[in-house]
Amino acid sequence: MIITILIAIFVIIYVRKNISQAKIAEAEAKSKKIIIDSEKNAEAIKKEAILEAKEEVHRIRNDFEKESRERRNEIQRLERRIIQREELLDKKSEAIENKEEVLNKKQQDINEKAASIDELYDKQREELEKLSNLSSDEARELLLEETKKEIRHDLAVMIKEMENKAKEEADKKAKEIISTAIQRCAADHVAESTVHVVSLPNDEMKGRIIGREGRNIRALETLTGVDLIIDDTPEAVILSGFDPIRRQVARIALEKLIIDGRIHPARIEEMVEKAKQEVENDIKEEGEQATFETGVHGLHQELVKLLGRLKYRTSYGQNVLKHSMEVAYLAGLMASELGMDPTLAKRSGLLHDIGKAVDHEIEGPHALIGSEMAKKYHESSVVVNAIAAHHGDVEYESIEAILVQAADAISAARPGARRETLEAYIKRLEKLEEIANSYEGVEKSYAIQAGREVRIMVKPEDIDDYGCIEMSKNIVKRIESELEYPGQIKVNIIREVRAVEYAK
């Protein structure tokens, strides 16, 4: 059994060995075939690569030859252009040489002619000096003087044209802003009286007001500081005094006494005290109402009281509080038209005349007094400057200051806003005509439009058109320095030339 197994094992080993050898032989045969095929493929690839390399070399050689031909052609073209330019330059050079020769000849001719002209000029100058009895220096001075006159004339024309253009543009813009502001500011107040008239129920009341031996009227005048004028006017007593607040106190006290009927010194003193308290309350209320209506908030209480006191002040008959409110409206509206914040402009306008509430108690111009009061109560520097500068006492430091000055002038110049005494009015008109007539060449002058315009007729043979311009400026300067007036005064110079001939 074991032998059989061993024989079987040997047989299996032998068979496997033969099979392995057969597979090895087959693999070797395949390897050789693969090697042979690879060698054949490598040879083919080598030949193909050599062929491609030869084709690439041929292509490169052709491209190089083509590029070389193109470069040679370009070089030849450039050479031809250079040759053409050289020929052109030669021609131009020849032409320039010819022109230089011609110019040299012309220059020589010019020099010869210049020499002859100089010689002729010297002869003519000598002849002119003999004929005119003027030396060359004198003639030069005369020529310079004539030239100066011509330049001055041209300069005056240019200045006039520029002034007219600037005035047209400025007037147009200013009129737009001011007209818009005025249209939006509906001012309905008129000039107010500076005296008070108290009506009486009958003429017998006059005797009771006077009292025994005049003690009642003396007590009332002493306590109020106001003069009582009792004359033949029926059923009326006139109160006259320097201080409008005192007049108001006297009016209220007198009206209360008339209603009460008991008029004696003790009762008068009691009523005067009540009237003073009533006026103080009214002053505060008026100040607060003014700030409310104008939209100006945050004022110090003392400034509010001073505003209220302006109700009892007038300037040329115009109520100062109403005027201040109108200036605030106008300044604010103009600031809005200019694209600015109207708050400061309105505040400055409302306070611009605050100094008039105290200027009879403190010495100095009301503008500077008002600015000091505003500064004392912590108003901004813009407001302080606007108050101080609205009459030109100091320089403007802001646009708001200029707007306040303009609004003040508009409010004051509005027809019916202010009035003057007849005597001051007549004196101002006479002074206007006197200033105009003081200039040489003035034929006559008229102050018209209630003193807001002076019309001047000049002699045309003495004053030319440009002299009129100079005269108008000089007259304006004198009016501004010598006269005091509300608003503005127009100086209108008229020069008329007439030529008359008669046909026979």
From Swiss-Prot:
Transmembrane segments: none
EC number: 3.1.-.-
One Gene Ontology MF term: RNA binding
GO cellular component: plasma membrane
Keywords of the record: Endonuclease, Hydrolase, Nuclease, RNA-binding
Domain HD: 320-413
GO biological process, one term: mRNA catabolic process
Pfam families per record: HD, KH_1, RNase_Y_N
Alphabetical list of CDD domains matching this protein: HDc, KH-I_RNaseY
KH domain location: 194-279
Broad class of enzyme this protein falls into: hydrolase
Family: Belongs to the RNase Y family.
Job description of the protein: Endoribonuclease that initiates mRNA decay.
NCBIfam families: HDIG (TIGR00277), RNase_Y (TIGR03319)
HAMAP family: RNase_Y
The protein's name in its UniProt record: Ribonuclease Y
Gene label: rny
